[in-house]
From Swiss-Prot:
Protein's gene: sec61g
Coiled-coil parts of chain: none
Entry keyword set: Endoplasmic reticulum, Membrane, Protein transport, Translocation, Transmembrane, Transmembrane helix, Transport
Alphabetized Gene3D superfamilies for the sequence: Preprotein translocase SecE subunit
UniProt function note: Component of SEC61 channel-forming translocon complex that mediates transport of signal peptide-containing precursor polypeptides across the endoplasmic reticulum (ER). Forms a ribosome receptor and a gated pore in the ER membrane, both functions required for cotranslational translocation of nascent polypeptides.
Organism for this UniProt entry: Xenopus laevis (African clawed frog)
Side of membrane Extracellular, spans: 62-68
Listed name of the protein: Protein transport protein Sec61 subunit gamma
One GO term of the biological process aspect: post-translational protein targeting to membrane, translocation
Subcellular location field: Endoplasmic reticulum membrane
Gene Ontology, cellular component aspect: Ssh1 translocon complex
InterPro entries to which the protein is assigned, alphabetical: Prot_translocase_SecE_dom_sf, Translocase_Sec61-g, Translocase_SecE/Sec61-g
Amino acid sequence: MDQVMQFVEPSRQFVKDSIRLVKRCTKPDRKEFQKIAMATAIGFAIMGFIGFFVKLIHIPINNIIVGS
């Protein structure tokens, strides 16, 4: 019985701590959500532009190398 409790007790403690964490968490309000969404969108746009310019630079370089 001790061996069974040795495996069950950490799981029980984890579930108890997880439930406590979820109860303490709160949903972001509308203003906070919009701020996070805007920051994420700006990040995506910046990464897209960086990828576009890298591709734009590598196309002529690739044509020079392959065209030779």
